[in-house]
């Protein structure tokens, strides 16, 4: 992807919808957190404003699993109605709390690996009583209801029709992170417009969407149709979107690990871990393939950037290795990723691409502000 700001692009930036999507992946959320810290730093530099935050620049921020937690951290307001966490605060959060969230407690074959109590405790401490409607920009955080067998998407823009989705952010964050076999499912209740109790029985958003890019685009489309701020956009299409999608890495050793001959001998237990990884990798690859194809077909390939490390090895591939050594390794993975080429066909580095993306976000924000002042 090469983000070039042409005169025609600049003229339409004010009418574009900006979307940030963050994948799930447990402790591997440190990788996109590293990218977010770099991007927010670039936005602060471009606009000469140390208080600039990602929520100031994106119309929709979507996340699933650990990506949902990152979404909440950068959109939940503090007492000054600014994001309670800057991007640079996210990695310290993982280092401070990751080892306790993923604290080993023996062998668990018939129950979740972790009890989730510390995770819920820290979410309540950090997010307080904040609800979805208070988010500083539109959010799209996914989960899956095991009772209704349907995905649940928590957003601001649809609360008038579905007020029961105006849940507390800590309930949402625990739910989107409650990966089956790792954490217990989460039950909580809200109220409908009639005052009736509405029950949720939720597990990890990765069950519905490991890569929430398409979900985030759907929310952005509805936002453009219903929000008066986007009245000038008659019919939103991919040419009017800037989409930044952040992955949590895929296992480069996975393809070497299994063969059809070996898998033919597997039973339920042997399939559990590989099947989860296969499903996650396939979902991520297919979303990226689809989006790349569509944006390119519409001559809008400059509007989409997928930042993903496809060469994870060793402990860096694990969902829950929160040892200090592995977390340091994941930070290094994120920092090294910035120096890598966007693709085999595009030798521009992610660092350069993100700098250009930051400039586009800044220009678009200024154009919209100028338009609003008239």
UniProtKB/Swiss-Prot annotation:
Keyword Glycoprotein included in the entry's annotation: yes
Keywords, sorted A to Z: Glycoprotein, Lipid metabolism, Plant defense, Signal, Storage protein, Vacuole
Pfam name, any one: Patatin
PTM: N-glycosylated.
Residues annotated as glycosylated: 48, 191, 257
Subcellular location(s) of the protein: Vacuole
Regions crossing the membrane: none
Family: Belongs to the patatin family.
Identification of the protein by name: Probable inactive patatin-3-Kuras 1
Organism: Solanum tuberosum
Originating gene: pat3-k1
